[in-house]
């Protein structure tokens, strides 16, 4: 009877999932996914070219890439202070975006972006995966999918809201709105987060008393780990193919994301249509992330790698031909809802399947840091290519090739890993 009652108790880990959803909603959904709204209005008012202006997002991503390694080490050494690091990141990121609203020179945006990068990783995957891995053994995939779906919810809501605010009150008010709304999302998350179940006198979801968790480390279940070490992984071709695939995927995905609204308005669509299309992308993402995770569990790593690449390829092709008919922006929205989701959900799944869980965190952090280059330079690359070609058409042609390369690389990595059995060592 007591066991039955215990099972029916609400598990605080789902509060942690909700908190992670809020972190992703602000850190990715607002701070990253809504940046494209500001490209045209800022450049037109301040006289910037699009390439140099969008470099500020590259700077923020580049600084964040190295900050991720630092936070990874800090989280390892001082796990009890993770919530404090997230609180610090909240202040830094919200402050930086408010600072954008006061900027008048390019270097203002660059300096604030570098400042933003020092805190942005606390609101990203490293915090999310650490918290969820601490709290869940079973249903970890579901918890992860739900958490990352937060970016789609917030972006779907905030894209049309910010577009309207920028049109009616100017881009400066738009940046201020981003800062204040994000602060309202992040403060409750910081207050509710608990780093481990031990802080609430609990065990991870799926671990029963006496199973897995030792007396001295109640928050860390002792599970049998399989796979290869990071030292072994970096000596395999599969590891570098995995990174190349992730790098290409990030280049195409982030290269499109920040320029969709600008491109659609350039080819004759209204700002309302463009923002609605981007908002629909974020809406589709809410369901796509959860659906992709469930499908991956069913079909295995090699088909999952193929599906991942196809989602991105279909997105670029749909955007390339967005001018064919008035329905095409919405076809793109459907495709990119899945394509954009491949920048989060497949990474941890494929790395875990290809290389195992023995040193998953070490392999994942290294691969993510390197592949983050694609996320950081892609918006600026698209802007620079636009300035060079005079339109986005050839930019999308290039990204079609990049998406094919991503598909081939990820599939090859999964096949090699399966043949060699890296994940089963």
Residue ranges and their predicted role:
Residues 42, 122-136, 342-355:
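Intracellular juxtamembrane helix-capping segments at the cytosolic ends
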Residues 25, 96, 107-123, 247, ...:
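Hydrophobic core of transmembrane alpha-helices in multi-pass small-molecule transporters
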Residues 67-80, 289-300, 386-387:
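Helix-to-loop junctions at the C-terminal end of transmembrane segments
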Residues 279-285, 289-291, 296-350:
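C-terminal transmembrane helical hairpin of 12-TM major facilitator-type secondary transporters
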Residues 151-200:
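Helix-loop-helix hairpin linking two adjacent transmembrane segments in secondary transporters
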Residues 114-149:
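Cytoplasmic helix-loop-helix junction between adjacent transmembrane helices
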Residues 31-42, 231-292, 378:
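Extracytoplasmic gate region of multi-pass secondary transporters
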